[in-house]
């Protein structure tokens, strides 16, 4: 498994949307400015818009709030939550652990490198821009009970978001939500 410690540390530093010089970042992470620049490119590859201003350093266009596993876990009544900053696919993560899962177990990620939709179609999942999650639920009635479930869940989540003030949220068939 690849080590993402440096890019993730850079994201946590830059999350305040203030400028941080390459020199400061290098000192903090114990590496050269050139190495910092290489890791900044990784952030860009992940879909993060990083401003580079000579003489000022690096900055994000606006602050970002990263996922907090403890805070999310407090909100989950049934099952366990796993929050991973970088993952191939939340769905694949659960599929690889089917024998260990309980109904209600959730996998949430900041970034998916190989997110998949219906019929295995891949899509780009920029870091920290959307909510990437999969939930495992054992259906006692079998797979036939899941027909239409994806659409119903999308509609319910859209209604909850609307009640919280996200008036422009819309459902795209079958379960994508857009704000």
Q: For each predicted feature, which ranges?
A:
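N-terminal lobe of the biotin/lipoate ligase/transferase fold
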Residues: 2-162
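Catalytic palm active-site di-aspartate
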Residues: 167-179
